[in-house]
Amino acid sequence: RQVAEVADVVELGVPFSDPMADGVTIQEASRAALADGVTLDWILDLVAGLDLGTPVVLMSYLNPLLTRSHGELASQAKAAGVDGFIVPDLPYEESGPMRQALVPSDLALVQLVTPLTPPARRRRLAGASSGFLYAVRRTGTDGRERARRHRRRRRRRTRGLRRRAA
């Protein structure tokens, strides 16, 4: 219950073997989670055992969700205590079947907008989004800039070590 005091919503990521929109950190976390046997079913079981007092949404690429029908996904997610989904690689124009399957279970399908989303499309996505609208801070992969800074720092340290060794 303490989570509800500091968070409006909890986002849990479903690992995927090819997280193309994610940066190095999340890619490595996905690989490690998959290697440890984390699956959509594992995450649903985890959520079912939690009592956070705040909504839980699953961030997932579409492929892991397609291991079952949209209707099965909705009923299993609702039974586990999930409140919605963020599916970054599911374009709004193709989201109708999933959205329709989630509505009877009162599950949200959160849409994403970026700084480059045209205003008319942003309004359309805001109207179609349920739960909340996910505003991506910048375009590109998550964690890219942080990873770049980390590599630069590592190179500087390595150069310093090479100079001392010479």
Regions found by a protein language model. Give the residues of each.
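Active-site mouth loops of central-metabolism enzymes
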Residues: R1, P55-S69, A108-T117, E145, ...
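Short amphipathic alpha-helices and their capping/turn segments at secondary-structure boundaries
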Residues: R1-V10, P119-A126
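Glycine-enriched alpha-helix->loop->beta-strand junction motifs that scaffold or abut catalytic
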Residues: V6-A7, A77-G84, V103-V110, G127-Y134, ...
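Glycine-rich phosphate-binding active-site loops on the catalytic face of alpha/beta enzymes
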Residues: V9-P19, A80-I86, P91-E94, Y134-R144, ...
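Active-site-adjacent beta->alpha loops and helix N-cap segments on the catalytic face
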Residues: S17-I26, A35-A48, L65-E72, V87-P104, ...
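N-terminal small/glycine-rich loop or linker at the start of catalytic domains
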Residues: G23-A29, L50-M59
